Amino acid sequence: MKEFDIISIGGGSGGIATMNRAGEHGARAAVIEEKQLGGTCVNRGCVPKKIMWYGAQIAEAIRDYGPDYGFTSEQTRFDFATLRKNREAYIDRSRNSYDGSFKRNGVERIEGRARFVDAHTIEVNGETIKAKHIVIATGAHPFIPSVPGAEFGETSDDVFAWEELPSSVAIIGAGYIAVELAGVLHHLGVQTDLFIRKDRVLRSFDSYIVDGLMEEMKKQNLPLHKHKVPMKLEKLEDGRVKIYFEDMTSHVADHVIWATGRKPNVQDLNLEAAGVTLNEKGFIAVDEYQNTVIPGIYALGDVTGEKELTPVAIKAGRTLSERLFNGKVNAKMDYTNIPTVVFSHPAIGTVGLTKEEAQQTYGKENIKVYTSQFASMYTAVTQHRQQAKFKLITAGPEEKVVGLHGLGYGVDEMIQGFAVAIKMGATKADFDATVAIHPTGSEEFVTMR
């Protein structure tokens, strides 16, 4: 029987980071993964999405902005096979890098599906393995609604397996995955329609920024269909898929993509044998230290439903290993002021509270809001002027910055530095005292009045 100090069930970003940090501190660590290392992010999420987003950015630049910069594009041809080949080569290099980090840190890789036998014992491929500490980092998978014909729809996982782009696609969902896929496919030349249940996309984001994005989607001729609740999917004889909605309308597309949320990967883990419990939403219940209800068993990342972002899982995992193996007994992940980017067209960057959240937290009378709206210089010299919208939210007499939100060209690369400032408790006066970099979009954040 193999024995370890710590094991991760799941070889995604969170599990890998946790075990590598534990190994750095001398722990006997192992990662159990039945599929490819890297999890959703590397294989079916952040990485392939971002590469395709870059491709869409290039297509947008050639089509919309190139002519006004003096570049003609009559002969430009897009070959998706080339993008796909280079995307997959990059992903392969990323996956291969894990073997090197495991070797440096003494982490063992075990291929197979794990299930609990008891609180300190798991079974993999018929073999029993024991560990003092077990981390559940199994991630999540796309949720597919229970409607007739749902199986004729696909998910984001399937999109990244396409060998060629379709002529048309219908995306169902209003979250960041739906918005990002819609933008990417639209700008790569696919007839893309986005269907949402209510009247807004990204409903948890600041309304000022979301309004701006929806205006840009309209200008870019990306159809957004509101108040559309799918009732049934049907496969037509020509291979296309027809969606029937509750309002008695319908739509036909080559592919239908479900982007309706994600569910935790807890099936077949035999959690009952270990005594691990789920919360009311079906995610593994943990406290602020990533502890489950069973001592020695932890969970982090998407399987907990807490801020489902790759860097959050990585940070939580490294912090856990610092607590367990480096004497930092009070170390825990701080889930406040986590910066987030939506790779839409244009991108959204945000950190801290929305206006609505700030009003609830501090009281409407105690907050102050600053906004700025302009056309980014990159697009302002062209016929396709793209708006940028920036917003600062401050609280209290000292005007502590509690929320920063941006929509516009380059926002995705701006937000990290401002997140540091907000994490440190910067005030509006601190922002005002900072000399602007001109001409940039980011200068708007330090010149608002």
What are the residue ranges of the model-derived segments?
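Beta1/beta-strand and adjacent pyrophosphate-binding region of the FAD-binding site
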Residues: 1-12, 165-172
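Glycine-rich flavin
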Residues: 2-4, 20-27, 32-165, 198-202, ...
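Flexible, glycine-rich terminal cap/loop adjacent to redox cofactors
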Residues: 7-14, 18-35, 40, 47, ...
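Glycine-rich dinucleotide-binding loop and its adjacent helix/turn
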Residues: 46, 138-191, 223-224, 272-274, ...
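A Rossmann-like FAD-binding core segment of flavoenzymes
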Residues: 111, 115-123, 129, 188-288, ...
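FAD-site-proximal beta/loop scaffold in flavoenzymes
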Residues: 151-166, 251-327
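A conserved FAD-binding loop/helix module that cradles the flavin
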Residues: 212, 300-359, 430, 438-449
